[in-house]
């Protein structure tokens, strides 16, 4: 649905929900790629801007009742827009002007996996457009309707989808839990030419052009912390996680991590001290951490 769906949703006797462009696909695409969802325009100033991402999400999510939001179709790609994998190459144009091969050039699978992590942990109904799970590329309609890549699938990406879908289905907090943007401090590593706004020590809102998205999904039993580092540098993060109900002294379990080389389900523990989590994030990575009260 294009435009504000409020008039169709607020009475409860017309639409149940919508294809969630305004409150999911578009803000996430701007944040991770700086691209418009058709690949028709680039806005570099929006890439990595947590402020713009959060403001957009809060504004457009307000058009939904909770029940409508939780079943909204949260897509990364579909039949009307360029494939999200293609958007990661940040090429502006269409197949008619750039050629179909350009849709596959310079793509960033790690950024695509970051998007899938958000898709599977954000309020709504994750909806996968055929072929996305196999790494299919394509500019906007009709190039986005390519044949499924039989025999040429990205097997690692398929396995990743299978595992993160399982995680989504196994944990109610990721489906119906509350959502909270988390606050903290971070510091980039491995870059001798940091801009002033890249060193965020003392900034308690993680706002600005920082390419770092941190939020929680939680209910009374489980608390999940999701961190996405969409930057080409590693970074050390100190995150206030007590706000989402995690005890001030606790141990969080890593559920999954995605990075430039792939993904891993290898468990790892992180200590929380005085309500603060300290964690090092690899470049172009996404991490899901969990605290389960029933086991503590």
Outline where the language-model segments fall:
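Intrinsically disordered, low-complexity repeat regions of secreted/extracellular protein precursors
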Residues: 191-205
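Short, solvent-exposed loop/turn segments at secondary-structure junctions
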Residues: 1-3, 78-82, 134-136, 220-222, ...
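Aromatic/acidic polysaccharide-binding cleft in carbohydrate-active enzymes
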Residues: 9-12, 74-100, 116-155, 206
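Solvent-exposed beta-strand/loop surfaces of large extracellular or lumenal domains
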Residues: 254-276
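Active-site-proximal helices and loops of the catalytic beta/alpha 8
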Residues: 1-67, 72, 118, 135-163, ...
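C-terminal beta-strand-rich structural cap/linker in extracellular carbohydrate-active enzymes
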Residues: 268-296
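Carbohydrate-binding surface patches
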Residues: 183-191, 207-246
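Acidic/polar loop patches that form or flank catalytic/metal-binding clefts of enzymes
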Residues: 126-130, 170-178
């Amino acid at each position: 649905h294009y435009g504000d769906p409020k008039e169709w949703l607020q009475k409860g006797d017309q639409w149940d929900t919508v294809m969630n462009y305004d409150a999911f696909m578009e803000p996430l695409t701007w944040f991770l790629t700086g691209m418009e969802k058709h690949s028709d325009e680039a806005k570099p100033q929006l890439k990595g801007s947590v402020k713009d991402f959060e403001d957009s999400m809060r504004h457009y999510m307000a058009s939904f009742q909770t029940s409508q939001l939780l079943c909204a179709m949260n897509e990364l790609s579909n039949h009307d827009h360029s494939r999200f994998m293609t958007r990661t190459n940040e090429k502006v144009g269409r197949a008619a002007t750039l050629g179909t091969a350009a849709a596959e050039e310079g793509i960033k699978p790690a950024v695509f996996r970051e998007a899938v992590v958000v898709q599977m942990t954000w309020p709504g109904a994750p909806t996968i457009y055929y072929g996305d799970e196999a790494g299919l590329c394509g500019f906007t309609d009709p190039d986005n309707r390519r044949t499924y890549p039989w025999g040429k699938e990205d097997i690692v990406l398929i396995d990743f989808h299978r595992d993160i879908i399982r995680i989504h289905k196994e944990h109610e907090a990721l489906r119906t839990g509350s959502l909270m943007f988390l606050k903290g401090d971070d510091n980039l590593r491995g870059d001798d030419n940091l801009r002033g706004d890249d060193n965020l020590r003392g900034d308690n809102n993680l706002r600005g052009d920082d390419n770092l998205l941190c939020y929680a999904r939680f209910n009374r039993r489980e608390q999940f912390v999701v961190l996405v580092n969409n930057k080409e540098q590693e970074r050390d993060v100190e995150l206030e996680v007590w706000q989402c109900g995690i005890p001030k002294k606790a141990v969080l379990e890593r559920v999954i991590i995605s990075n430039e080389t792939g993904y891993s389900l290898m468990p790892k523990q992180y200590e929380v001290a005085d309500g603060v989590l300290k964690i090092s994030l690899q470049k172009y990575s996404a991490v899901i951490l969990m605290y389960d009260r029933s086991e503590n």
